[in-house]
Amino acid sequence: MNKKILFTGGGTAGHVMINMVLIPKFMGKGWGVEYIGSQNGIEKLLVQNVKYNSISTGKLRRYWDWENFKDPFKIIKGCIQSYKLMKRIKPDVIFSAGGFVSVPVVIGAWMNKVPVIIREPDSTLGLANKIALPFTTKLCTTFPQTGENVSNEKKVYVGPIVREEIERGNVLRGRSYCKFQQDKPVLLIMGGSQGAQWINDMVRGSLETLLLNFNIVHMCGKGKVDSSIGMEGYIQFEYIGEELPHILNMASVVVSRAGSTAIFELLFLKKPMLLIPLTNSSSRGDQVLNAEYFSRQGYAEVILQDRVSTNTFIHAVNKLNTNKERYIQNMNGYTKTNDEGIHQLIDIINEVVK
């Protein structure tokens, strides 16, 4: 009888991406594959070609909201739904990429004695994975320092896993897609899957100066394109889909938030990056720690948005471009490969099932 694996994870594109890498690998080996996600999350849009099961879930907020009173009941309902799904599907293993939707799934699996592997993308454990940790068999980390208080028997440092297609990007296709008229270095601006209004405003306030030295590709986020701007050498997108590998490969330098998925993709592509992490006031601080780690390794420049003016932003971008060869040299010293991480994770899953 074929083995079965259930994937879960959602809330952001980063929590879904690793599942999108692994799902075809297991389908290709003849495993039965299904997914458990939320009813309206981004994972429902991204997951294709496998059976998708929706459950009720609450958001694990760190701030005051009236919804906090309802969410425990949603999570309990999600645990019951997950428990019943485990009884029906009878999976051999659960792989969780994190996010609030994963908590009921992990608990439902534990109640059915199904082994669970969770993956933490950031340098510190997210709240969902902290809650899930006692119910899991293995914790796979992206950063070597993650989970310092977790036993070595449970914790495994796997390293980053990114979309394989990003390494197949073509610079000429990227240039053709953007249709830039002048041969200048390309500055790519990425604000994360939801966009970043602060970054958008800073870039638009700096355009006149930045366009003297760069062609600019600006990924703004849904509904955040400013159609009133028509400056030569500046192109805006809400989101870039299948052309993204070509845009990434075309870029000379990148301004980005500091989500784990994005910055490791840039590391694999050896793209000098200026990181502007989400602040501690608007997140749990994981992006600040991710950015600090990359800065210590010499992979990135980091600026904090509450300490930046238009002039300091422009200076930081120009400094990054001037010193880009130094950053590339530092990134060449990173020895982990994407294939290595994928194969190690598959081996861990196979070992747990045995």
From Swiss-Prot:
Its EC number is 2.4.1.227. One of its GO terms (cellular component) is plasma membrane. Pfam families: Glyco_tran_28_C (PF04101), Glyco_transf_28 (PF03033). It is an enzyme of class 2 (transferase). UDP-N-acetyl-alpha-D-glucosamine binds at T12, A13, G14, R163, S193, Q287. GO terms for molecular function: UDP-N-acetyl-D-glucosamine:N-acetylmuramoyl-L-alanyl-D-glutamyl-meso-2,6-diaminopimelyl-D-alanyl-D-alanine-diphosphoundecaprenol 4-beta-N-acetylglucosaminlytransferase activity; undecaprenyldiphospho-muramoylpentapeptide beta-N-acetylglucosaminyltransferase activity. It catalyses: di-trans,octa-cis-undecaprenyl diphospho-N-acetyl-alpha-D-muramoyl-L-alanyl-D-glutamyl-meso-2,6-diaminopimeloyl-D-alanyl-D-alanine + UDP-N-acetyl-alpha-D-glucosamine = di-trans,octa-cis-undecaprenyl diphospho-[N-acetyl-alpha-D-glucosaminyl-(1->4)]-N-acetyl-alpha-D-muramoyl-L-alanyl-D-glutamyl-meso-2,6-diaminopimeloyl-D-alanyl-D-alanine + UDP + H(+). GO terms for biological process: carbohydrate metabolic process; cell division; cell wall organization; lipid glycosylation; peptidoglycan biosynthetic process; regulation of cell shape. InterPro entries: GlcNAc_MurG, Glyco_trans_28_C, GlycoTrans_28_N. Keywords: Cell cycle, Cell division, Cell membrane, Cell shape, Cell wall biogenesis/degradation, Glycosyltransferase, Membrane, Peptidoglycan synthesis, Transferase. It is a peripheral membrane protein. Its main location: membrane. Cell wall formation. Catalyzes the transfer of a GlcNAc subunit on undecaprenyl-pyrophosphoryl-MurNAc-pentapeptide (lipid intermediate I) to form undecaprenyl-pyrophosphoryl-MurNAc-(pentapeptide)GlcNAc (lipid intermediate II). Belongs to the glycosyltransferase 28 family. MurG subfamily. PANTHER family: UDP-N-ACETYLGLUCOSAMINE--N-ACETYLMURAMYL-(PENTAPEPTIDE) PYROPHOSPHORYL-UNDECAPRENOL N-ACETYLGLUCOSAMINE TRANSFERASE, UDP-N-ACETYLGLUCOSAMINE--N-ACETYLMURAMYL-(PENTAPEPTIDE) PYROPHOSPHORYL-UNDECAPRENOL N-ACETYLGLUCOSAMINE TRANSFERASE 1. This is UDP-N-acetylglucosamine--N-acetylmuramyl-(pentapeptide) pyrophosphoryl-undecaprenol N-acetylglucosamine transferase 1. It comes from Bacillus thuringiensis (strain Al Hakam).
